[in-house]
Amino acid sequence: MEFYPGFDIESRTQDMEFLYGDDVFGPQPEKRTLEAIRSSLQDPTCTGPEILYSIVMDVGRKQDKAAIEERNLLYGAVTYAKGTLGKEPVRSQGHIHAISPSCQSSTCEVYEIWDGEAFIYMQEYGKDDAGNCYAVHAKAGEVVIVPPGWVHATINANVEKPLTFGAWCVRDFGFDYEDVRAHHGIAYFPIVKEGNITWEINPAYKHAKLHVISAHAYPQFALEPGKPIYTQFVE
């Protein structure tokens, strides 16, 4: 991988599996299929990879497991296939983080790209007025934070290469798909044109304003650029 995440984990993209070092814990991956997200795509009848992405929730070094659990945190890793879904790149359908029972609120997610490049797409609301929408372009080693309560989706920004990333979230996480499914997708569809990603409004929304930006540092949260967010937790 282009960026070392701070512990011994590897993505085996040819069969969408993860390999763990001897000192690393983690589950068998869950694999998400094209069939599962068709209704959220611009073209629900499109063809594309059968397995879109593989996800392992709750991974890390065995020596850190108790500390992660005590802080009610969970670290996950995901690999996305390369390729397209009709005119769109491989992506997730989008969701909002449900109310966490322990926090009594929706919670944020902290992404870190390990290999490839991504657009972390987010929109303020899931209703007819989506409000401000951001497509944040992130490369290996860069971090993106999704605020609580925002609709968000992960998009492989390079259709020629798989995407792998890690993310911190609350341990008692949950996903709310209701608003996204009611609108047959997110407010802007990513469209591949001549190898680049462009954006087309989803007509199911009455209003939305898109901002396409690059990933940036987060000094306000004391995150050190270039240092794995897993390592920063340990330290």
Indicate where each model-derived feature is located.
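Active-site region of the double-stranded beta-helix
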Residues: M1-A138, N156-E235
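Histidine-centered metal-chelating micro-motifs
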Residues: V143-V144, P148-A153
